[in-house]
Structure formats: structure tokens, C-alpha cells
Amino acid sequence: MSVRARVAALTIVLIAATSAMACGGRFFGKQYEYEEDLYLATDGSAELIVNASIPALVSLRGLPLDVDPATQVDRNKVRALYESPETEVARVSRSWSRDGRRFVQVRMKVRDVRKLDAVAPFSWSHYSLGEEQELRVFRQTMGASALRPGTMQNYGWKGKELVAVRLHLPSRIVDHNARDIDSNEGSAVQRGNILAWEQLLTDRLDGRPISIEVRMDRQSILYTTLWLFAGAFTAAVLLLCGIIWLTMRKGAREAATTS
């Protein structure tokens, strides 16, 4: 293969990867059939991103959407399904395809995560956020899916598809119950203060609960960092003032001795 051909091939791969990530897909790593990313603020407000296949939204949440992969997703209909007094939809992406299924991404602002279960697509979860023993505690329990016995259709699922819930947290994490789906050992906090709970799609369809609990500091990392920065800056200013004062005092003494 010539150098020019290699460059062209690499360019195509990079464009494909960029397009997939822009649409919410994951070019590298695990692939998910349904995932929620919750960016939580200390006051209970949040930003929430849902990436999901249309068949998953129909089967898991009972949303009235067209599962035909040849049909473009009705983005206005998706927006209407997620819009509510508690949520403000910022964007519904263009759909993309994977394994013969169409996927879509929905980005929204959540006014109060504690009321999110009043929104139909999230009514399978119960949310709480409060303070216990000088810590802020977030809990989410994801319950039964909308799938009814005898209604399951063949969407090309092979049984290994995954569902994920990720929390992007504002404060230092003290304790959590996230576990690795493969080893069943406690998961480490990911870079960016992120925790993930994963489950097989088959288990989610069966309604096996996902129990989420996180204990964290009451103050946000940003707030703590700003205070540390302010303290360090104040200490530096005081040190500089001290050096200047000592220098001026030494100069005054030398001048007095000379005279």
C-alpha cells in the first residue's frame, strides 16, 4: 500500500471514530445497548445523557418508537417523550446504526434528581440525595423494565449486550458499592470522579434490580480546590510581604549604621 493510500485510510478511520464519538457511540472499548450518564451537582440538579438503541428503549421503557432499522428516528417524538416539568431536553442526536439497530442520544438538564422518577422514561428508578453523618449520600434503585411476558421480539441481541449507569460526581468519594461486572470485585473510581454500574441486558429485561449507593463529601471538589488555591495564594502573598518587610528593615538598619 502506498503512503498516500495509507494516509487516506487513516483519515477515514479517524473521521469514522470522531463521528461515532460525536453521536455518543464508543469506537473503542465496551459497547452498550442502553446507558445513562448522570452528571450530578451538589444541590441535586444534574445533566443526564442517555445513549440507547431504539429496541432497548421500546423493550426496557415501553417507549412508542419505530424499531425498523431502515426508518430514521423521529427526533421530535423522542424529545417529547423525555421533555417534562422536571427535565429540559437540550439535544436529541441524529441516529446511528450498529449491529442492525438504530441508536440515539438524548441530552437533558434535570432540575432535581430526587424527582426524576416522575418522568416516564426514568420511572423504573427511585432516587434519593441527602446528608448522613456529615456526608452527602446518593442512592438509586433501578427496578423492573417495561417488558411484558410474551412480548419479546428478535432484535439481533446475542445475550452479551450490556447496560450501564454512570455517575459523574461533584465531591470526593468516600464509599460506594460499584462492582466490576466480570470479576464482581469493587470497582475503582475512574478518572474524572466517575463510577459505573454495569448489568447484562438480559438481566435488565428480567427486571433484576441495580442498587446504587455513593457517600461523598458535602463540599464539591471545585469548591475545595478554590479554597486550597486561595489559601496557597494568601500564604504566598504573606510570605512575599514578609520578605519585603525584612529587606526594607535590613536596608534601614544598614543606612542608620552608615550615617
Q: Each predicted region: which residue ranges?
A:
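Structured domain cores in non-transmembrane regions
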Residues: 53-133, 138
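Intrinsically disordered, low-complexity linkers and stems that provide flexible hinges
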Residues: 132-233
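Bacterial signal peptide processing site
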Residues: 24-27
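C-terminal single-pass membrane-anchor helix
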Residues: 218-259
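C-terminal motif of bacterial Sec signal peptides marking the signal peptidase cleavage site
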Residues: 19-22
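Post-signal peptide N-terminal segment of mature Sec-exported envelope proteins
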Residues: 31-51
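Bacterial N-terminal signal peptides that target proteins for export
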Residues: 1-10
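A mature extracytoplasmic/lumenal domain signature
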Residues: 38, 50-54, 110-112, 169, ...
